[in-house]
A protein has these predicted regions:
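Extracellular glycan-recognition surfaces and repeat-rich motifs
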Residues: 65-102, 110-113
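Short, aromatic/His-centered strand-loop micro-motif at the edge of beta-sheets
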Residues: 174-195
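Secretory/extracellular carbohydrate-interaction modules
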Residues: 105-174, 232
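Extracellular carbohydrate-recognition regions
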Residues: 42-77, 251-262
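Beta-strand-rich interaction surfaces with strong enrichment in secreted/lumenal proteins
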Residues: 114-121, 182-188, 228-229
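Bacterial N-terminal signal peptides that target proteins for export
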Residues: 2-15
């Protein structure tokens, strides 16, 4: 009997030891199914990338004095000046050539190109250049246009329009020689405002009249330069709201639309 009791006591001690070992090593073994609360992971807030502001340069000449060359511009050839014009798209002033100018000589009548250039030394490569233009008259010609990628007075590109021949042309001045690159017939009346625009990107040019693309053309002779305005012979050309928007500073080049039919 003593031996049996002794054996039972020994068994009880061993069992108690096993229970204590389980409690110490694995508390989960006797837990009543308690679950840990999930900790929420903070959601990362994405900061949107700001859209770059387009780089725009604009001149409306309304703060400049009539009869003088406006601030930021230089007359290369011709009597360019601010003109008070009630018909100006942005009143009261335009920039152009007044009536009553005399040509240097009759022999220079077909090769006289008055022009004015903005004085900022910035040279534009990819950009949109646009302006309001009208021709108020002229005995020999009624033309005007936008100069771009101007290197000097003998090397630049030109988008011009005029009457009475109703021409709309892209040209390049190379070493003083004006070379016609592409031309189309576009009705152009005297004393009527038109919006000329050229989009230049690399060697590709898209040319517009009143927001209608007339044609596009590829030429890569001049990579960059300044901008300006131009006239031919004794044309009384006027310009307003000259604007340059740099492509690549928040401005994308437009998708080319089908061009109007062009004459050879």
């Amino acid at each position: 009997m003593k031996t049996q009791n002794s054996w039972l006591r020994s068994a009880a001690v061993v069992a108690a030891g096993v229970v204590m070992t389980v409690l110490i090593i694995s508390p989960a073994a006797y837990s009543k199914g308690k679950k840990k609360k999930a900790v929420a992971t903070p959601t990362e807030t994405m900061t949107p990338t700001p859209t770059p502001t387009p780089e725009v340069h604009m001149w409306n000449f309304d703060q400049d004095k009539a009869g003088e060359v406006p601030a930021g511009w230089k007359a290369i050839e011709g009597d360019w000046q601010v003109i008070a014009d009630p018909s100006a798209p942005s009143k009261p002033n335009t920039f152009g050539l007044p009536a009553g100018r005399l040509l240097k000589s009759l022999t220079s009548a077909l090769e006289y190109y008055p022009m004015a250039i903005e004085t900022d030394p910035t040279e534009y490569s990819d950009f949109t250049l646009e302006a309001q233009f009208k021709s108020a008259g002229g005995r020999f010609d009624c033309s005007g246009g936008l100069i771009f990628r101007y290197v000097d007075e003998k090397n630049f590109y030109l988008l011009a329009a005029g009457c009475p021949s109703d021409y709309f042309a892209l040209s390049r001045m190379t070493d003083g020689q004006l070379i016609n690159l592409k031309q189309s017939v576009v009705p152009t009346d005297k004393d009527t405002w038109y919006r000329l625009k050229v989009v230049a990107q690399g060697g590709h040019f898209m040319c517009y009249d009143d927001d209608k693309m007339i044609f596009d053309f590829d030429d890569s002779k001049i990579a960059k330069g300044r901008v300006g305005v131009w006239a031919r012979d004794d044309s009384q050309a006027e310009f307003d709201d000259v604007k340059v928007t740099v492509i690549g500073a928040g401005e994308s080049a437009p998708t080319p639309a089908p061009a109007a039919s062009a004459s050879p």
